[in-house]
Structures are given as C-alpha cells and as structure tokens.
Amino acid sequence: MIAKHGNNSSTSLSGSADLLQHAQPKAPVISATTNKTLPHIYDKSNYALLYARDWHPGMKHAAPIRKEVPVRTIFNLLGPLANPLQDTGMVECCVLGVARKDIGENFAEALRLGNARKALVVCGDENLDEVSCAGPTHCWYIREEGTSVDITKLIVAPEDFGLPRHPLSEVHGGKGPAENAKILMQILRGELPDDHPVLHFVLINVAALLVVSGICEADTSSMGAGDDGNVDKERGPGGLRWKEGLRRARWCISSGEALRQWEGFVEATNEHAQ
C-alpha cells in the first residue's frame, strides 16, 4: 500500500495534488480520502494520496502567504515529515526527498526518532529532492539491525539500477499540472518508449522504495503475468539489490498493474465524493 502525502504547489509549477486533479479522462477526488474512507479506498487500490490541506486543516491558513513568498520556507521542511500515517504504525517503510544535502542526516535522524525502521532519505547531487537520473544521489538509509536502528550514508547512481544517466533538462516537468498529468497517464499506460528519460527517472524512484521495503531481498518472484521469475541478485551500494528494484518497477508498468491500481483509486474516491 502506498500513502503519498501531497499538496498543491507553493513554490513550484505543479504539486502532486495539482497533477492528480488534472488527470484525464477522469480525475480522482483527492479530498475524498479521509481517515474514515481510507480502508475502503485501500480495498479498491493499493494507492492513496493524503491531501495535506484536509489532513492538516490548520495549514490552509499559511497557504496564501506561502504562495507570495518566492523562496522555500520552514513549511518545505515540515511537509515531508508530516505524513499523517507516520505515527500510526501503519507505515512500514518510506522514501523521503530533501532539496539540500546538508539536512539529509537531520531528516534521517528525525525519522529514526519517529520510530521509522525502514526508510531512505535522498538528495540528488544537484540538491534535487528525488533520486537523480543525472548523477549521484546522496542517501541516508535507516534500517533496524537487531535491537538498534542504524543510519548508513551511501551514494547511488543510475548505473546502480542498470540505467544510463540523463541530464535533468531531459526530464523537466511540463509547463503546468495538466501537461504533467498527461505525462503521468502516458507512463501508466505504457506509452513511453522503454528508454525514455522520464520513464527512467520514475523507475529509479519507484525502485528505491521497493528496495527499502525489503521485497527485493526475496530470492523468488511471482508478481503475476509477465514476471519471468528471474530475480536480479546483484548487489550495489549498501549491499542492496537496486537492479532487482528496477526490474520490479518495470513490471508494475508493463503488466498494467500500476494503471489498474490508479483506476481503482479514481473509482473509489469518486464513489465517496457522491
């Protein structure tokens, strides 16, 4: 199950909530995801967006001011740590992006103190709050080892996933949420070429979550139709199977499973909005 904590844009062209609200032919009703409806939504899909303005209603008072300030503020730091499910014990693992390398360790420590047991804080070498497709990504890996929870610093690059590097100029988002939503649907429908830079960018970030979850440590694989079961056991930075994460991420799209889960999310949220 995925619980994406997202919001409308304050300092960029398009936030995750903006993108989903512009999806075609039918958009999910993100405000319909509440603590009461979440169990039903997860019955229909393994994905949910937790709309920050609904789950943290007090924050709406800061939204107009944030839009007027042309730089990042403390809210850009608080948002990633404020997933409303984080303290419920429901979150098994997480990947959190930060836009400055000098605060990566602080975020990792905050997650550790918040009882995270499997997590990855990432910052691209360009101070990108994603796993970078252009070069190295600085990572702080939180994992439980016996009775302790340790933080390990490591660096991953696209080649650790078995992919080439792409300049960030090749994966720049659209001019607005509508264009970004169109790209999202092209990815989910498998309409982008296998070597498309944007697809590679998405795949390595999905793969990172799969790696941290621990599922890539399995020596067998039976995801469903189209899975040949050939687990990639090669290990990379941190002794982890980054290429196996990529293999599983590709299957999610090629099998149509990612699209089916998206459609389930759209259907469930629209049902609750009626």
Where in the sequence are the language-model features?
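Glycine-rich anion-binding loops and their surrounding alpha/beta cores
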Residues: Q21-Q274
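Active-site cofactor/substrate anionic-group-binding motifs, chiefly glycine-
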Residues: M1-S10
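Active-site-proximal loop->helix
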Residues: S9-K26
